[in-house]
């Protein structure tokens, strides 16, 4: 253990997300080793927002893990958006295989789209179940804290308005950002509802 006076109070450098609104909602950028949950209703644009963000991070080695779309589908969306073609795409739902790929490519940021599609062989439940979601999120949290590599989890809000099965994920992750809006309006809102490293009073449009 360290004595309190031995610990530097200097803020750890944050990762620039190349999106002023997202940076502000995060509290000034993404904290290394943190785990962020981006939640919202299915179809509101969580995947597009995240893909758009990482495609503009030219100086970062990013691994985008999709359990919902094929590489071809992601490629088509990425071409429409434009940006960093060096982003690595992995279509996988096994948490163990995801970790094997992470060890191989050594990314600086990992995106999981979505946490409801990922499963671990340690749990005898189907993907998307409360037990699977909780165990996978906890394993990804341990990975982020020990490696210093930040993880962004995309999670769907159900009809009751909760993230990925009651509020179980909100207690595990460092930051929860809710992506809100209406299909009839042009603008969407990013709302921070939990942030260990910043304010929860910030909104992004």
Protein language model regions, located:
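Conserved P-loop NTPase
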Residues: 1-4, 104-107, 116, 172, ...
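The Walker A/P-loop phosphate-binding site
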Residues: 1-84, 99, 103
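Flexible beta-alpha connector loops of hexameric P-loop NTPases
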Residues: 11-14, 39, 63, 83-92, ...
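Conserved nucleotide-binding/hydrolysis micro-motifs of P-loop NTPases
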Residues: 42-44, 68-72, 80-83, 93-97, ...
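Loop/turn-to-beta-strand initiation segments
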Residues: 61, 85-86, 106-109, 146-153
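Short regulatory helix/loop adjacent to the ATP-binding pocket of P-loop NTPases
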Residues: 78, 162-172
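Conserved P-loop NTPase "ATPase switch" module shared by AAA+ and STAND
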Residues: 105-125
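Substrate-engagement module of ASCE P-loop NTPases
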Residues: 131-152, 156, 172-183
């Amino acid at each position: 253990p360290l004595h309190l006076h031995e610990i530097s109070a200097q803020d750890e450098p944050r990762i620039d997300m190349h999106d002023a609104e997202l940076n502000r909602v995060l509290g000034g950028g993404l904290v290394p080793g943190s785990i962020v949950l981006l939640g919202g209703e299915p179809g509101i644009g969580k995947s597009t927002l995240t893909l758009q963000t990482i495609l503009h991070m030219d100086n970062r080695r990013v691994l985008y893990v999709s359990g919902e779309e094929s590489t071809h589908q992601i490629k088509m969306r990425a071409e429409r958006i434009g940006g960093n073609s060096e982003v690595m795409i992995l279509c996988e739902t096994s948490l163990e295989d995801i970790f094997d790929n992470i060890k191989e490519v050594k990314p600086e940021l990992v995106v999981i789209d979505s946490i409801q599609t990922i499963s671990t062989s340690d749990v005898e439940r189907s993907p998307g179940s409360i037990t699977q979601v909780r165990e996978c999120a906890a394993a990804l949290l341990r990975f982020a804290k020990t490696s210093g590599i930040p993880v962004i989890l995309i999670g769907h809000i159900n009809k009751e308005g909760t993230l990925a099965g009651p509020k179980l994920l909100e207690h595990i992750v460092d930051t929860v950002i809710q992506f809100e809006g209406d299909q009839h309006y042009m603008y969407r809102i990013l709302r921070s509802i939990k942030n260990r490293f910043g304010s929860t009073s910030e909104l992004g449009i």
